[in-house]
A protein has these predicted regions:
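The feature represents the first ordered module of a protein
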Residues: 1-60
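Aromatic-enriched hydrophobic runs in primary sequence
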Residues: 34, 50-53, 64-67, 84, ...
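Short helix/strand-capping connector loops at secondary-structure junctions
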Residues: 58-72
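Short, compact, well-ordered microdomains
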Residues: 68-95
Length: 95
């Protein structure tokens, strides 16, 4: 049985969408697999994404934005989700 921690999907009125998914997974760093994405559904443009889906040149934990990909600190999935939500709120307010 899969231990899902978060499985959230929200579409905003401006046609942007936020998806947050995380589950316990022993094969991933911190024993958690996650992907958090905020994007424009009309254009497909990624506005913000956090994930640990692969080991990139910037480390296991990374942040994708319009300016590229960068490593990001990871303490725990709860705080990581809150940080993502805060960034989404800021980006959404400026759209």
């Amino acid at each position: 049985m899969v231990d899902v921690l978060y499985d959230d999907d929200h579409v905003f009125r401006d046609s942007s969408r936020m998806v947050i998914y995380a589950r316990r997974e022993s094969d991933y760093p911190g024993n958690v697999y996650y992907r958090m994405q905020y994007y424009d559904m009309e254009t497909g443009e990624t506005l913000l994404r956090y994930d640990n889906a692969h080991d990139s040149d910037v480390g296991h934990y990374h942040r994708h934005s319009g300016s590229g990909v960068e490593g990001i600190d990871f303490e725990n999935i709860h705080d990581h989700r809150l940080r993502f939500l805060s960034e989404v709120e800021q980006i959404h307010a400026n759209r």
